[in-house]
C-alpha cells in the first residue's frame, strides 16, 4: 500500500458523537487521496442505507484537526503510521453565518457588545449608541469627551439596563438606562487612570468591573449603584465620581485586553508582549505568558479554558494557562492578511471563535482548524476594530467604515427555520 505517495487504500473507522449520524463501527477501506468531498459522499451513502436519511454536510477530523486537503497528505504531515486503522471523526458542518444588518454611525465604531435584544456601540465621535438587534436605532448617548474604546453590559432586564464605557478621556462611565422611557443617566464617572482606558470587563456577578489603560495599570471598580465605600467624601459621592477599589501594576505597556476568568481571577493582554493572569484575592500575578508580538486583544473560554490572542501580525494564537510551559503556543491560526485587532470565543460552542482584522474581514474559526477559517464574514469596507459574540444568536462587529455589521449565527438561523 503506497499511501505515502498518495496512492492505495487506507483502513479507517468512522466515528461521530452525534448519535443520529452514526454509521456501523467497522473498518472501511478508502482511497488515500480522498478529501472531505468524497468522505461526505461516502458517509451520506452509508446513512441512506441505514435509515434513508437525506444528505447532511459534514466536516472531518483526523487526529483532532480538520481535514483540509487529501487524507494521505494530512497523515504524512502528522507523521502518522499507516499500519493501523485511522480513526476519522465527523461532525455536522456549522452553518455559514448570514449577514442581517448594517448599522450606520457617524464615525469609526471602536466598541460593540450585544445582550438580549440590544446592541451597544461606542464611537470615535465620543458617543455611545443603543440599537435593537433588528437594526433599529434607539438612542445616542453623550458624556465622554474623547473616543470610546470599550463597552460592556453590567445587567439587563425588561425595565433597566446598566452598562459601562471607557474612553481616551481617561475615564470609565457607568450608565443606567430606563428601557420603558428610553432615558439614560450617567451614574458615575470613574477616575483614576492617567491615560486613555483601552479595555473593560464586568465580573460574572455584575458587582465589579476591571479596566486596562495606556498608563499600564489594571484597575478594579465597584459596578454597584451605590459603591458603598466608607469614608468617601461627600463631594465625591454627590458628584458621582468613583475611584478604584484595587490598582494592580505589572505591565510595561498598554493593557489592551481584560477579561474575568472567574469571580477572583482576571486575564490581561498588553502591548508589552505578555498575557497575565491575576489573583484578586492576593492582588498579584498568578501566571505570566510571554508572547512574541504586541497583544491587541485576548479572549478566555470558560468552556475549554484556553486563551486566544490577536496580535500585531496576521495570526491568532492559542495558549493554555494551565501548562507549566506558559510561553509555548498551542496553535497558530492562519487566514487574515493584515494585523488582527479583535478576537472572541463563542460563549456556547466549545471549539468556535471569531476574529476581525485590518484586512476588513471577520472570520469564524474552529480551533481544530488552524490552516483555514470555517467562513469569511464579509461586509466591512475598512478595518475591523471590535467583534462580539456574547449573544449566541448574533456575531456583531464595528469598524473604520462607520458601521456595525450584524450576522445571524446558527441559533438565529435555526429559529428562522422554525418560524417558516
Swiss-Prot record:
Cell compartments where the protein resides: Nucleus, Nucleolus; Nucleus, Nucleoplasm
Gene3D superfamilies: YVTN repeat-like/Quinoprotein amine dehydrogenase
Residues covered by region (Ubiquitin-like (UBL) domain): 10-92
Keywords, sorted A to Z: Nucleus, Repeat, Ribosome biogenesis, rRNA processing, WD repeat
Repeat region (WD), residues: 104-142, 143-185, 192-231, 250-288, 290-329, 335-375, 379-417
GO molecular function terms attached to this record: ribonucleoprotein complex binding
GO cellular component, one term: PeBoW complex
Biological processes, Gene Ontology terms: maturation of 5.8S rRNA from tricistronic rRNA transcript (SSU-rRNA, 5.8S rRNA, LSU-rRNA); maturation of LSU-rRNA from tricistronic rRNA transcript (SSU-rRNA, 5.8S rRNA, LSU-rRNA)
Alphabetized HAMAP family for the sequence: WDR12
Record-stated family: Belongs to the WD repeat WDR12/YTM1 family.
Function according to Swiss-Prot or TrEMBL: Required for maturation of ribosomal RNAs and formation of the large ribosomal subunit.
Protein name: Ribosome biogenesis protein WDR12 homolog
Organism from which the protein derives: Drosophila sechellia (Fruit fly)
Amino acid at each position: 500500500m503506497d499511501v505515502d505517495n498518495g496512492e492505495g487504500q487506507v483502513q479507517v473507522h468512522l466515528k461521530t458523537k452525534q448519535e443520529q449520524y452514526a454509521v456501523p463501527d467497522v473498518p472501511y477501506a478508502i482511497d488515500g487521496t480522498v478529501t472531505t468531498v468524497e468522505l461526505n459522499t461516502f458517509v451520506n451513502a452509508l446513512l441512506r442505507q441505514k435509515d434513508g436519511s437525506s444528505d447532511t454536510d459534514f466536516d472531518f477530523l483526523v487526529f483532532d484537526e480538520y481535514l483540509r486537503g487529501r487524507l494521505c497528505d494530512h497523515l504524512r504531515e502528522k507523521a502518522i503510521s499507516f499500519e493501523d486503522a485511522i480513526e476519522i471523526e465527523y461532525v455536522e458542518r456549522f452553518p455559514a453565518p448570514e449577514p442581517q444588518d448594517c448599522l450606520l454611525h457617524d464615525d469609526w465604531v471602536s466598541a460593540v457588545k450585544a445582550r438580549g435584544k440590544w446592541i451597544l456601540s461606542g464611537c470615535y465621535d465620543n458617543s455611545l449608541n443603543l440599537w435593537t438587534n433588528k437594526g433599529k436605532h434607539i438612542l445616542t448617548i453623550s458624556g465622554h469627551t474623547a473616543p470610546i474604546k470599550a463597552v460592556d453590559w453590567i445587567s439587563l432586564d425588561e425595565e433597566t439596563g446598566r452598562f459601562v464605557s471607557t474612553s481616551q478621556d481617561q475615564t470609565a462611565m457607568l450608565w443606567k438606562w430606563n428601557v420603558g422611557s428610553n432615558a439614560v443617566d450617567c451614574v458615575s464617572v470613574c477616575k483614576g487612570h492617567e491615560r486613555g482606558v483601552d479595555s473593560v470587563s464586568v465580573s460574572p456577578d455584575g458587582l465589579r468591573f476591571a479596566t486596562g489603560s495606556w498608563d499600564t495599570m489594571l484597575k478594579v471598580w465597584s459596578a454597584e449603584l451605590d459603591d458603598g465605600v466608607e469614608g468617601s467624601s461627600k463631594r465625591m459621592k454627590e458628584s458621582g465620581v468613583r475611584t478604584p477599589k484595587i490598582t494592580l501594576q505589572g505591565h510595561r505597556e498598554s493593557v489592551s485586553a481584560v477579561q474575568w476568568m472567574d469571580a477572583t481571577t482576571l486575564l490581561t493582554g498588553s502591548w508589552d508582549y505578555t498575557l497575565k493572569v491575576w489573583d484578586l484575592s492576593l492582588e498579584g500575578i498568578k501566571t505570566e505568558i510571554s508572547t512574541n508580538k504586541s497583544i491587541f486583544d485576548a479572549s478566555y473560554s470558560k468552556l475549554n479554558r484556553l486563551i486566544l490572542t490577536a496580535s500585531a501580525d496576521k495570526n491568532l494564537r492559542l495558549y493554555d494557562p494551565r501548562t507549566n510551559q506558559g510561553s509555548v503556543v498551542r496553535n497558530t491560526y492562519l487566514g487574515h492578511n493584515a494585523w488582527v485587532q479583535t478576537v472572541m470565543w463563542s460563549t456556547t460552542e466549545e471549539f468556535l471563535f471569531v476574529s476581525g482584522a485590518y484586512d476588513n474581514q471577520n472570520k469564524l474559526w474552529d480551533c481544530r482548524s488552524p490552516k483555514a477559517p470555517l467562513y469569511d464574514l464579509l461586509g466591512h469596507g475598512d478595518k475591523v476594530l471590535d467583534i462580539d459574540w456574547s449573544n449566541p444568536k448574533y456575531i456583531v462587529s464595528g469598524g473604520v467604515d462607520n458601521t456595525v455589521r450584524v450576522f445571524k449565527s446558527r441559533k438565529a438561523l435555526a429559529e428562522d427555520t422554525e418560524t417558516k
